[in-house]
Amino acid sequence: MSEKLSAKQYAEQLLYKPEYAADKQPDVKEKAAAFAEGYKNFLDHAKTEREAAATSEQMLLAAGYKPFEPKKTYAPGEKIYFIQEHKAVVAATIGQKPFEEGFRLVIAHIDSPRLDLRPNPLYESDHLSYFKTHYYGGIRKYQWGTMPLAIHGVFTRADGSSMSFSVGEDENDPVFCITDRLPHLGAEQNDRKLSDGIKAEELNVLIGSDAVEEEDVKEAVKLNTLILLHEKYGITERDFTRAEIEVVPAHKARDVGFDRSMVGGYGHDDRVDAYPALVAEIETKDPMHTTVCVLTDKEEIGSDGVTGMQSMYVFHFLQLLCRAAGQDDIIAFQNSVCLSADVTAAYDPSWAGAFEPKNGTYAGRGVAFFKYTGSRGKSSASDANAELVGDITRLLDANNVAWQIGELGRLDLGGGGTIAKYVANRGIPVLDIGVPVLSMHSPFEVIHKTDLYMAYRTFSLFCQAEQ
């Protein structure tokens, strides 16, 4: 007859005690800090989805990846990639097993909430020149006032040539800003709802104040600004109508905290998952299953468009691989597994009322899983099977990877979604995973280095797994 355990012994055996990964594994701090240095560099060079795609392509080419050829048959170990319309990346390492035994996909997104210039953005008012903007994604508009801003983009000229540019990132560059009311005259604004603290039509970027010297010239400040742009970039006002220009925070990624345990910066959502997913794919050697890393676009506005996951570009790539090898893509999809790599909210003690503590995810406890996302009654969610959650978490447990699982926040306050459902719609089982973020969708988000590192380890193990 077995000896009866004490309550304390039962507690040790049965209860789940969340732990902070760096506290439990001291060596993790050093490894996480080293990995974060590469990530910060990536973040600084990838302020827009175009820049993220271009930076990723440079990394892939340096690692020996070759451009994808649709009708070519590839051998195990070969590394291929393609760029979708300058804004999305697909990279793959051919596995030892046939495609019909399934792909292993990790999908993150590289677009972030921001301000876009309107088609006719340039105007003058009271001897000041401005750009009109149209916000992209779920920003809190009041957060974008009175901070240094940079302008990144591409012009397509009338002759068909194009030119990329960036102003505001170099120390010697000028910066730009959105002005706000002074508190002395803020009584009316103070009565606004928070969401209207700065309204969409007030998100106007200040870009100049000097006028041309000649008299009797209409809109002399606007003209002077345009002359400066023409002298440097060779563009006219009409060229704005065929441009893609984005306004982003001008600051660089920085360590946060006296202990430097965190990283603050713009664009963690979702480049904090995109970077480790890409590095894991690059480092993958001779996998059993073909691994596919996708850095997609347009997630922040519903994944629509030719570069979003509601498009077929990823699935066409997989189908073309199968067809060139004489294999059935439907069978391949049925045997595939996907990790939808997107950030989640980190529990914030300063805003505790937004969270349900027992089911929150915490900065420093490791990579976070979500069996489902959606809002309210799981609306628009992809709900992963328990078996898939078990398979992935067992892999991590066997390799001492810190992970946690939870929900976005309190029910009925709102919600959120990912690209998971668009992959699931193709018959591919998918599980949401990502790094918890403080101040998500703000111009300066914060993540814990340990969680970033654990995401990298998770993606690496997933790519190299035999099953």
Regions found by a protein language model. Give the residues of each.
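N-terminal hydrophobic/helix-forming segments and targeting peptides
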Residues: 1-467
